[in-house]
């Protein structure tokens, strides 16, 4: 396998980076561009930006900051938020983004994945999946419009089935957002990620739960994911990226310089 990726995630709302817990009660973290610049300088392998209310507000991602990001960082970055068409995606890629990610729009129109794949290439197309474990049913269920807690909806899809479906439509990468773990820093959902890995032939990125350096080691070694996405541990300075990468190298995890 290629070297594993460390990916800071920046949730954007009203032009600022915010962070919630289990997709709720978001607090403001800071300005977008300085944070992006900082993470790039610290050695992040790539960045992901989610305009978290774009889909629920029925609008496309606020593009005013995309060009500014492209001007100040030299690592790949992915942008998500309300992208409903090839035209929407094209504008964001033209502004300098390397990838676009779709989540709720893919659930509304799965053929959009194939359209993006055919237009821009599979490497550009990321599908984000917000997965919640329902203790009553014992099943992982896909949710949508999760950026606005008042509008979040459960879908008809069980997570494993949707993972298979998006691959058939041409997804180039999957980010699995484990909602139960989001922001609580108790570790990634290894059980779910391991099960999904068995049916995921494209790069799989784990999201939700990082709290300690060992959590990154565990998710790479036990769930065999290609990358680990995290937010609060980086935003709050709990785990400096250079320190994390040094630790992973000591643990014999293949990591990028």
Swiss-Prot record:
GO terms for biological process: L-histidine biosynthetic process. Keywords: Amino-acid biosynthesis, Cytoplasm, Histidine biosynthesis, Lyase. GO terms for cellular component: cytoplasm. GO terms for molecular function: imidazoleglycerol-phosphate synthase activity; lyase activity. Its main location: cytoplasm. It catalyses: 5-[(5-phospho-1-deoxy-D-ribulos-1-ylimino)methylamino]-1-(5-phospho-beta-D-ribosyl)imidazole-4-carboxamide + L-glutamine = D-erythro-1-(imidazol-4-yl)glycerol 3-phosphate + 5-amino-1-(5-phospho-beta-D-ribosyl)imidazole-4-carboxamide + L-glutamate + H(+). It is an enzyme of class 4 (lyase). InterPro entries: Aldolase_TIM (IPR013785), His_biosynth (IPR006062), HisF (IPR004651), IGPS_HisA/HisF (IPR050064), RibuloseP-bd_barrel (IPR011060). Heterodimer of HisH and HisF. Belongs to the HisA/HisF family. This is Imidazole glycerol phosphate synthase subunit HisF. It comes from Pseudoalteromonas atlantica (strain T6c / ATCC BAA-1087). The gene is hisF.
């Amino acid at each position: 396998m290629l070297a594993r990726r460390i990916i800071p995630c920046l949730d954007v709302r009203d032009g600022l980076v915010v962070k919630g817990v289990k997709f709720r009660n978001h607090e403001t973290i800071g300005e977008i561009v300085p944070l992006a610049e900082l993470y790039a300088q610290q050695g992040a392998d790539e960045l992901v930006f989610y305009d978290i209310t774009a889909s629920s507000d029925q609008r496309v991602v606020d593009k005013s900051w995309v060009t500014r990001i492209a001007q100040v960082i030299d690592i790949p970055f992915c942008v998500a938020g309300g992208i409903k068409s090839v035209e929407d995606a094209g504008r964001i890629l033209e502004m300098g983004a390397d990838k676009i990610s779709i989540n709720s729009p893919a659930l509304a129109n799965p053929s959009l994945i194939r359209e993006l794949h055919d237009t821009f290439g599979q490497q550009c197309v990321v599908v984000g999946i917000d997965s919640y474990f329902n203790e009553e049913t014992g099943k992982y269920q896909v949710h949508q419009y999760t950026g606005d807690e008042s509008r979040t909806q459960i879908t008809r899809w069980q997570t494993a089935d949707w993972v298979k479906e998006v691959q058939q439509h041409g997804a180039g990468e999957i980010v699995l957002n484990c909602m139960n773990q989001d922001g609580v820093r108790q570790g990634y959902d290894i059980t779910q990620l391991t099960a999904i890995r068995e049916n995921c032939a494209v790069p799989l990125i784990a999201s939700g739960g990082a709290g300690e350096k060992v959590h990154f080691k565990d998710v790479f070694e036990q769930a065999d994911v290609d990358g680990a996405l995290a937010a609060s541990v980086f935003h709050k300075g709990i785990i400096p990226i250079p320190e994390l990468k040094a630790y992973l190298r000591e643990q014999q995890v293949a990591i990028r310089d």
